[in-house]
Amino acid sequence: MSSHPPIRSYVLRQGYFSNAQRHAYESLLPRYGIPLTEEPVDLDSIFGRTAPGILEIGSGMGETTAEIARQHPEKDFIAIEVHAPGIGSLLGQIEKHRLTNLRIIPHDAKLVLQQMFTSESLDGIHIFFPDPWPKARHHKRRLIQPDFVSLLCDRLKPGGYLHIATDWEDYATHILHVLRSEERFVNTAVDYAARPAYRPLTKFEQRGMKLGHTIRDIIFTRTA
């Protein structure tokens, strides 16, 4: 067994933690958070119903996550986020909009997927604007790597989808290459897909578009 620590795709940059975010984090996480366990999570039990389950990896400040959950009450959503300000922000939005179909797991995505989700247990996975780690020496930190994609594919049901969005051209090319190398995945487009109606434009995205940045949506489905 290797003694080297795992390479993480994120750095815990705490950033500004507002009073409102801190209050939401401390008071609402026990209600809407799901603790890390070594047992598979039972979504039917958590949400009190049987519905399509969508996992979002890296929910950021949570605006997009909350909006998608608000617009799709027929689906259940699990957000994975490790940064406390973002967790607090999303918790506040869950409370504000009274979202009964959204919960948070505040832990590392790889560990969560390995321990808490079984094979063919998810209907969809969203990864919007993952850190591109643009410097070549940091490419090994990129979240989208063959072993992780294999894990994602395993956790999806046949017919389930993986949706990744990025504004970094080099990373988009890398993502396409990695996903095409997974034989259980098939692209829903030739290369990049049109932005689905369910993914709202973020403020970050709108600013980027004004600067001429191209947003690329990549959507693959599991075939078997």
Curated annotation (Swiss-Prot):
Pathway connected to this protein: tRNA modification; N(7)-methylguanine-tRNA biosynthesis
Record's catalysed reaction(s): guanosine(46) in tRNA + S-adenosyl-L-methionine = N(7)-methylguanosine(46) in tRNA + S-adenosyl-L-homocysteine
GO cellular component assignments: tRNA methyltransferase complex
Gene3D superfamilies: Vaccinia Virus protein VP39
Binding site for substrate: K135, D167, T202, K203, F204, E205
Chain positions recorded as S-adenosyl-L-methionine binding sites: E56, E81, D108, D131
Lineage top rank: taxon: Bacteria
Key words of the record: Methyltransferase, S-adenosyl-L-methionine, Transferase, tRNA processing
Transmembrane segments: none
GO molecular function, one term: tRNA (guanine(46)-N7)-methyltransferase activity
EC number: 2.1.1.33
Keyword Signal: no
Active-site residues from the entry: D131
Function: Catalyzes the formation of N(7)-methylguanine at position 46 (m7G46) in tRNA.
Protein family: Belongs to the class I-like SAM-binding methyltransferase superfamily. TrmB family.
The protein's name in its UniProt record: tRNA (guanine-N(7)-)-methyltransferase
Annotated source species: Nitrosomonas europaea (strain ATCC 19718 / CIP 103999 / KCTC 2705 / NBRC 14298)
